A protein has these predicted regions:
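Membrane-interface transmembrane helices that cradle and orient dolichyl/undecaprenyl
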Residues: 142-157, 191-194
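Short catalytic/ligand-binding loop motif for oxyanion handling, primarily in non-cytosolic enzymes
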Residues: 123-126, 174-177, 415-419
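Transmembrane alpha-helices and membrane-interface helical segments
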Residues: 94-95, 144-148, 181-189, 275-279, ...
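Long, well-ordered mid-to-C-terminal structural blocks that present hydrophobic/aromatic surfaces
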Residues: 289-386
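Transmembrane catalytic cores of multi-pass membrane glycosyltransferases
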Residues: 27-83, 89-90, 94, 129, ...
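Intrinsically disordered, polar/acidic, low-complexity terminal segments
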Residues: 2-55, 59-60, 65, 69-91, ...
Length: 498
């Protein structure tokens, strides 16, 4: 690790932050060209409520959002949160990468920080107009918390615990990033022949303190949202625990692999296999050096476990939940796994370092393409849904108000033609582009209905509606509209338009 900084290194750091920030701007370009709202955004732009962040166990997110708007009702100030979040994440990524002191020269020094920015699972977090800032802030603070501070042991633990408590009150998934970043720092300390066990012990103690404080204070007193409570329960001990754990592993593995379908899986398989070989080479090389055999054995055991920690940190503690949220946004620690493989390969194979640097550009560029495709898909889908709602409103206006009290959907609209190819090429986008008009899904519909001034309530779809024979009030290749006992039923089972 670097003990001092020259004026040249500070200038270099500032440039790296600027260039990394520019990469973030390029990546989010589709969000600038069109006004994109995502999921919860539709609800907040209409009612301005911010209290849900508190009941979700994220009081710091609430505080930051109301402070930014100088009001307890949160109005839309996008793209300011996204810009601020990208700047913070760029700065934290460069500072963290700098502390790794990898033997990179010139513009290749930019590579490590890009792993934290170009992360396909981060795309979903960036889509939230209201949450993007605090989600990226949580990631940034987790990286900073993993650094080995040059203080006494007590201050080190307290400072790290304080940062991690802020992480948990901002966005809980930041804990996974902390675990992954600690794995990378541990590996770098070991390569530098520095003591790793004091660092491991202090970071474990700090993480435990933060988790206990969060559980005792925040969860016990603030978390009341049914959704959060339902998805935060640990797997109960018993014969079914292993089955549930394996199901979680399968679900998260499928989510990760959906970002790298078919031959694209080589973009992660090759770096991983090379890192495994590199780690073995470094272990053999270290075992031949003079020193305490006992110390080398314990250090070697820790290093062997690091790749498994880096992989397990991707879903993190979600693996231990009985009903976890299986979503791309909880897998943002993917960045740490990718950076871990890169660090091992750069340090284990100095003879081919230039080739590794150059070839690393390929998976990073792939992630850029995937993220831009995700943003374009969501933007196009939002435009299509808005146009569809306008058509539905026009059809509803032809029905006398006294004849219709509710609305129901059968199935859901077919995908817009301009997103089908992206969904086919990148299966992960299916989990990012979440449809808002679905059968018996009142929450998703309600947030759109509020914005579009549609007063009809969405009711559950009855089996009788699907088999009803009636006269259609409107019919085309998108939907068929009919009335069923004062309920306007939109039947989307018409198939795609040709």
């Amino acid at each position: 690790m670097r003990n001092g900084e020259s004026a040249t290194s500070v200038i270099s750091r500032n440039r790296q932050i600027l260039y990394t920030f520019l990469v973030g701007l390029l990546m989010t370009l589709p969000l600038w060209s069109e006004k994109v709202y995502y999921r919860d955004d539709f609800f907040r732009i209409v009612n301005g409520q911010a209290n849900l962040w508190i009941s979700n166990g994220r009081p710091l997110t609430w505080l930051i959002n109301v402070a930014l708007r100088f009001n307890t009702s949160v109005n839309d100030i996008s793209p300011l949160p996204l810009l601020m979040g990208l700047a913070i994440l760029a700065a934290a990524s460069v500072i963290y990468a700098e502390k790794l002191a990898l033997p990179l020269r010139g513009y290749w020094q930019l590579l490590p920080a890009q792993f934290m920015i170009l992360n396909p699972f981060l795309a979903q977090s960036l889509l939230y107009s209201y949450d993007s800032l605090t989600m990226m802030l949580s990631l940034a603070m987790a990286m900073m918390a993993s650094l080995p501070f040059r203080f006494s042991r007590a201050i080190h633990i307290l400072l790290t615990a304080g940062l991690m408590l802020l992480v948990l009150t901002t966005y809980q998934t930041g804990l996974n990033v902390y675990l992954g970043c600690c794995a990378i720092i541990t590996f770098r300390l070991w390569v530098n022949r520095e003591a790793i066990w004091p660092y491991i012990g202090e970071k474990m103690a700090a993480g435990l303190i933060a988790a206990v404080l969060y559980k005792v204070i925040i969860v016990a007193w603030l978390v009341t949202d049914p959704y959060s409570l339902a998805h935060s329960k640990m797997i109960p001990p018993g014969p079914a625990a292993i089955t549930t754990l394996l199901q979680n592993v399968d679900s998260f593995t499928a989510m990760v692999l959906s970002a790298f379908p078919r031959y694209k899986v080589l973009l992660i398989a090759i770096p991983l296999l090379l890192a495994a070989l590199g780690l073995l080479i470094l272990l053999v090389r270290t075992a031949r050096e003079a020193g305490s055999a006992r110390r080398k054995m314990f250090n070697g055991l820790a290093i062997v476990l690091l790749p498994f920690l880096a992989i397990a940190a991707i879903p993190g503690l979600s693996l231990l939940l009985s009903d976890p949220v299986i979503s791309p946004r909880v897998l943002i620690a993917w960045s740490c796994f990718s950076l871990f493989c890169f660090c091992v390969n750069i340090l284990a194979f100095p003879a081919i370092r230039r080739w590794i640097q150059a070839l690393t550009l390929l998976p990073l560029f792939y992630c850029l393409v995937l993220m831009v495709s995700s943003f374009n898909t969501v933007a196009n889908d939002q435009r299509y849904t808005a146009n569809l709602l306008q058509r539905m409103k026009i059809d509803l206006s032809h029905i006398p108000p006294q004849d219709v009290k509710n609305m129901a959907f059968i199935d859901q609209p077919a995908d817009s033609p301009d997103i089908i190819i992206s969904l086919r090429n990148f299966p992960l986008i299916k989990a990012i582009r979440l449809p808002m008009l679905m059968e018996s899904a009142p929450w998703e519909y309600q947030v759109l209905a509020l914005r579009e001034n549609i007063a009809l309530r969405l009711t559950p779809t009855l089996p009788e509606m699907k088999t009803a024979t009636t006269t259609y009030l409107s019919q085309d290749c998108v939907y068929k509209l009919f009335l069923y006992q004062q309920t306007a039923v939109f039947d989307f089972r018409t198939g795609p338009c040709r």
